[in-house]
Amino acid sequence: MAVKEKKEFPPFEYPQGYQLFAGVDEVGRGPLVGDVVTAAVILDPNNPIEGLNDSKKLSEKKRLALLPEIKEKALAWSVGRCSPQEIDELNILQATMVAMQRAIAGLSVQPDMALIDGNRVPELPMAGLAIVKGDLRVAEISAASIIAKVVRDQEMEELDKLHPEFGFAKHKGYPTKAHFEAIEKHGVTEHYRKSFKPVKRILGID
């Protein structure tokens, strides 16, 4: 019987025959409210950025410190999104794929290959490669993760100013106990994803 190996992923080796790689990642598949946000980043190999790591493992302070450096040093970066209405129409998986397509299409320089965090690649006009735990293994994906996370968090903070009773700045729209209590008390706004089960239940749809 084989010895169970630790879940350590090997260092990523960039495929040969390609020059420009875009890293792509998403933030916000799980929340009940707001857009699913994706980012695409092409880094400059001659201008490396120290301290890139998966955005979820970095402190907010570190993410905010890295953001301007990524934007300044990257050859190109872009944000793509899908709205709650689009998520309800398409489903969250398809909406995430569309948001990734939009992020890549928005790059001022088009890559030879898109490196996508996860296990699915959207339909693209260039080569694409899905990389499990890519946000930990590939600098371009880490940079995309940081941009997407900061953008979405800031949008939740803005939404919190409009609707402070929901506590968006704290839970960022994710399904927490405090969030459910706020929905039970105040209902939902147009920013909610009405196809998500907890929201359907509150609205009496399901």
From Swiss-Prot:
Keyword terms: Cytoplasm, Endonuclease, Hydrolase, Manganese, Metal-binding, Nuclease
Leading EC class: hydrolase
GO molecular function, one term: RNA-DNA hybrid ribonuclease activity
Signal peptide as annotated in the record: none
Any one GO cellular component localisation term in the record: cytoplasm
Record's cofactor remark: Manganese or magnesium. Binds 1 divalent metal ion per monomer in the absence of substrate. May bind a second metal ion after substrate binding.
Ligand binding (a divalent metal cation): 25-26, 117
Annotated InterPro entries: RNase_HII (IPR022898), RNase_HII/HIII (IPR001352), RNase_HII/HIII_dom (IPR024567), RNaseH-like_sf (IPR012337), RNaseH_sf (IPR036397)
GO biological process: DNA replication, removal of RNA primer; mismatch repair
Domain RNase H type-2: 19-206
Catalytically driven reaction(s): Endonucleolytic cleavage to 5'-phosphomonoester
Cofactor field: Mn(2+); Mg(2+)
Listed EC numbers: 3.1.26.4
Subcellular location: Cytoplasm
PROSITE patterns to which the protein is assigned, alphabetical: RNASE_H_2 (PS51975)
Entry function: Endonuclease that specifically degrades the RNA of RNA-DNA hybrids.
Family as reported in the entry's similarity comment: Belongs to the RNase HII family.
Name assigned to this protein: Ribonuclease HII
Gene label: rnhB
